[in-house]
């Protein structure tokens, strides 16, 4: 196991929860038969201690210990405001 902490960058899609945000991580995958690159989205729940994020913000999140059943990521910084 590596010592490097895993970080991802994505767009905030929901901030309706208290101290939590939903971040959409977009990646491109090559289609196995046709070879065209397709956009795939993964939604991740992250911890936002100060409730500073709004919908549309681009944020950096990092992996942490499990904080709830679905939350094991924490907000590192807001890259750009919406």
UniProtKB/Swiss-Prot annotation:
One GO-annotated biological process of the protein: translation
Record has Ribosomal protein as a keyword: yes
Keyword rRNA-binding among UniProt keywords: yes
One of the record's GO cellular component terms: cytosolic small ribosomal subunit
Gene3D superfamilies: Nucleic acid-binding proteins
PROSITE patterns named in the record: RIBOSOMAL_S17
A Pfam family: Ribosomal_S17
GO molecular function: rRNA binding; structural constituent of ribosome
Entry keywords, A to Z: Ribonucleoprotein, Ribosomal protein, RNA-binding, rRNA-binding
Similarity comment: Belongs to the universal ribosomal protein uS17 family.
Physiological role: One of the primary rRNA binding proteins, it binds specifically to the 5'-end of 16S ribosomal RNA.
HAMAP family attached to this UniProt entry: Ribosomal_uS17_B
PANTHER family associated with the record: 40S RIBOSOMAL PROTEIN S11 FAMILY MEMBER, SMALL RIBOSOMAL SUBUNIT PROTEIN US17M
Quaternary assembly: Part of the 30S ribosomal subunit.
Name of this chain's protein: Small ribosomal subunit protein uS17
Gene: rpsQ
